[in-house]
């Protein structure tokens, strides 16, 4: 999962990465806790 996320994160914006990897349950450099509750504004 790490390699796949790294590749996606490198070529796509963090918003796209969030949409594809629902940071809920995933831990990554572009994953913020508020994304889980969609309170990131």
From Swiss-Prot:
InterPro entries for this protein: Conotoxin_a-typ
Post-translational modification note: Contains 3 disulfide bonds.
Gene Ontology MF: a single term: ion channel regulator activity
Subcellular location per the Swiss-Prot or TrEMBL entry: Secreted
Keyword hit for Secreted: yes
Location of 4-hydroxyproline modifications: 13, 29, 33
Propeptide residues, chain positions: 1-11
Protein's UniProt keywords contain Glycoprotein: yes
GO CC annotation terms, alphabetical: extracellular region
Record-listed Cysteine amide modification sites: 40
Domain of life assignment: Eukaryota
Similarity annotation: Belongs to the conotoxin A superfamily.
Function: Probable neurotoxin with ion channel inhibitor activity.
Protein name per UniProt: Conotoxin Ac4.2
């Amino acid at each position: 999962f790490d390699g796949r996320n790294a590749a996606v994160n490198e070529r796509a914006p963090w918003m796209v990465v969030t949409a594809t990897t629902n940071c809920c349950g995933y831990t990554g450099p572009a994953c913020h806790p508020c994304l889980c509750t969609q309170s990131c504004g």
